[in-house]
Regions:
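N-terminal capping segment at the start of a domain
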Residues: 33-63, 75-81, 95, 212, ...
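A non-catalytic alpha/beta surface segment that caps or lines the substrate-entry region
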Residues: 54-115
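Alpha-helical metal-binding/catalytic segments enriched in His/Glu/Asp
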Residues: 113, 125-126, 130-131, 135-192, ...
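Metal-dependent peptidase/peptidase-like ectodomains
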Residues: 118-120, 186-277, 297
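His/Asp/Glu-rich mid-to-C-terminal helical/loop segments that flank catalytic regions of hydrolases
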Residues: 284-330
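PDZ/PDZ-like groove recognition
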Residues: 328-372
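Conserved PDZ fold ligand-binding element
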Residues: 367-387
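PDZ-domain C-terminal substructure recognizer with occasional recognition of PDZ-binding tails
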Residues: 392-420
Length: 420
């Protein structure tokens, strides 16, 4: 879940009407407030044991989809297509990652609603609502956790709740915005962005003038330093200044240019739609049964959701949002690797190493003495500058090999021997 930044210039010549519109938009943004109790209610239900971890294709996913559909219906939103808020899709997944014969067909459900302002342009605000279920698809970071409920409060009941609350704000205010909003809740993300791929395939047919996509994935664990990663800022020249302009005073931003990352904005970027991706970072509960609702930073999530509300308003008032291909996406593909270091990477592109946000117990990094907060700079002789070069370096390592791994700790270089 992530992503760096280019500097930009923004030139705007505002007519009197334009100034009035901008002023009103800012006034509206300040008066409309996210309801923290709504966020909490949605997350506690979606991340409850009743939903059994919301695995795509499961009964828990169906319960979640019905809940989300009911919320959209209460708001009086329109259908995206067909006769219900649900968009069905299918894909194959291997139940045993080492055996092709275990492949099975999974039927997933996106939940999509439209605020139709009869506008020429459309913005998508989305998040995935699926999670790992009982670890049937082997995506957990906890060994031997099959059968344990992975509730996925941060990943991604948090983003889902934010989309629901934004749908409420935009549909219940007394303003007819300059754009239509599509509120999209995806399933199949944990198996490879399957649901967002389905919507991205049809979006330009149903809404040809879709100009932007905002994705929220894991926005519920704002840390004590108030660090928020915003990816995709290189996908349009207007974005670096815009995300800074509306930044809440308490938030520290890490900006990343790339339109590609391990979350649903990628599907839209690949259709030449500019994107933003918001992410509060990985943590030791990531993809574990312990990612529970009581661990969410609800005031922090409220701040982030208000931030997205302001960004979505501002983007709707832009006359044009040009699309830019980002350098990393043009030159990088996701490599295949045979080993894991057992860390949680920081996806901010710092160019001088990759920060380690978490270290998983009893995995190679932890066993070697690498700590959370270290900055990874080398695996063997392969230099690590950010998450993409980290993946390249990891792809060169074979299981059973030992390599020196270099990190910076409190400004001092340290080398550890890691057995992969």
């Amino acid at each position: 879940v992530f992503l760096s930044i280019t500097k930009l210039k923004q030139v705007s010549i505002l007519s009197l009407l334009g100034i009035s519109t901008l002023y009103y938009s800012q006034q509206k943004s300040n008066s409309e407030q996210v309801n923290e109790e709504n966020l909490k209610k949605h997350i506690y239900y979606l991340a409850s044991d009743e939903l059994q971890g919301r695995l795509t294709g499961s009964e828990g996913e169906t319960k979640a989809a019905n809940y989300l559909s009911a919320e959209f219906k209460k708001l009086g939103l329109k259908l995206y297509e067909g006769k219900e808020f649900i968009q069905n899709f299918e894909y194959n997944v291997k139940l045993n990652p080492h055996d092709d014969k275990t492949s099975t067909t999974v039927k997933g459900k996106n939940v999509i609603a439209v605020l139709d302002n009869k506008a020429e342009k459309t913005i998508v605000i989305g998040a995935h609502y699926d999670h790992l279920g009982l670890n049937e698809h082997h995506n957990s970071t906890l060994a031997n956790s099959q059968g344990q409920i992975h509730n996925g409060a941060d990943d991604n009941a948090s983003g889902t709740a934010a989309v629901l609350e934004l749908a409420r704000l935009f549909s219940q205010n007394k303003t007819k915005e300059n754009v239509n909003y599509i509120f999209a809740l995806f399933s199949g993300e944990e198996d490879g962005l399957m649901g967002s791929k389905k919507l991205a395939e049809t979006i330009k047919t149903n809404y040809p003038n879709t100009i932007f996509m905002i994705n929220m994935d894991m926005v519920g664990r704002l840390n004590k330093d108030n660090n928020l990663t915003v990816g995709g800022v290189g996908t349009s020249p207007i974005l670096p200044d815009l995300v800074k302009k509306y930044k809440p005073e308490s938030i520290n931003l890490s900006l990343d240019e790339s339109g590609v990352g391990p979350s649903d904005h990628t599907s839209f970027y690949l259709k030449d739609i500019p994107v933003l991706f918001l992410f509060t970072g990985t943590h030791t509960d990531y993809h574990k049964p312990t990612d529970d609702a009581e661990k969410i930073n609800y005031p922090g999530q409220k701040t982030i959701t208000n931030y997205v509300f302001n960004l979505a308003n501002a983007l709707g008032n832009e006359k044009e949002i040009p699309f830019t291909k980002t350098k990393v996406a043009a030159t990088k593909s996701v490599p295949k690797y045979k080993v894991s270091l057992g860390i949680m990477p920081n996806y901010a592109d710092t160019k001088d190493g990759m920060g380690i946000d978490g270290v998983i117990d009893n995995r190679p990094a932890a066993n070697a003495g690498i700590l959370q907060g270290d900055i990874l700079t080398k695996i063997g002789t392969c230099e690590v500058k950010e998450v993409y070069s980290y993946m390249d370096c990891l792809a060169k390592v074979n299981s059973g090999e030992e390599h020196p791994v270099t990190v910076k700790r409190n400004g001092e270089e340290k080398v550890f021997t890691v057995k992969f």
